[in-house]
Amino acid sequence: MIHRLPNDSYYAATARGLPVQPQLTGSMTADVCVVGGGFTGLAAALACAERGLRTVLVEAVRIGQGASGRNGGQMIPGLNVYARDLVALLGHDAAVALYRLAASARDRVHARIARHDIACDLRHGHIHLAAKARDMDDFAAEADFANAHLGPGSAAIIPAADIGAHVGVSGYHGALLTPSGGHMHPLKYAEGLAAAALAAGV
C-alpha cells in the first residue's frame, strides 16, 4: 500500500516540475533498477548511468514526493553531536573519520549542483547562534576540531558584537559560522538530479 502525501507544500508550489515520464508497462531489461525517486535513488541512478550502466528508475508517485522533496533544505556541517562528545564516545580516529565522511557527503552535493547546473536556490553558509554563554565553549571546541581535521577556515567564531551584521538580530552570545553549510530548495534539487539522470540516459 502506498501512503499518499498531500502535494500542497511550499516546495511543490515553487518547483518547476518535470516532464511526465512514460509509465512502466510490461517488462524492461537494465543493468540496474533503482526503486524510488528521492535523493538516494536519484543520485544512485545518475552515478550508474554516468558509469555506462543501463539504468532504470521507478517511482510510484513523483520525483521528490517523500522526505527528499519536503525536508528543510539545510546542509548543516558536522554531526548531531559535538566533536568532543563523539571523541569521548568512539575515540579520536573514528570521530575524525565520521566528520570527514559527513563533509565529503556535503561536498558531493555541492559538486553535483555545480556540475549539472542545478538551479535549487543554493545559499552558502550556516550560523549556529549561542543562546547561552556556555554554548560558546562548545562552539570554540567545535571550530577547533573542524579547522584541525577538515582544513583551516572550515569554521569560525562570531563574537556577540558582530551577530547583527550576519543575521540582523542581537541578544545572542556569539555564533559558530560554517561557510561550507547552506540551504537549498530540496524539491528543485531532486528535480535537477532527475533532469541530469534523464540526460545521462536513465
Predicted regions and their residues:
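Dinucleotide-binding Rossmann-like beta1-alpha1 core, especially the glycine-rich loop
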Residues: 78-161
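Flexible hinge/switch segments at interdomain interfaces of large molecular machines
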Residues: 162-170
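Extreme N-terminal leader/targeting segments of oxidoreductases
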Residues: 1-32, 50
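Helical element adjacent to the flavin cofactor pocket in flavoenzyme catalytic cores
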Residues: 137, 144-147, 171-202
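N-terminal Rossmann-like FAD-binding beta1-loop-alpha1 element of flavoenzymes
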Residues: 28-57
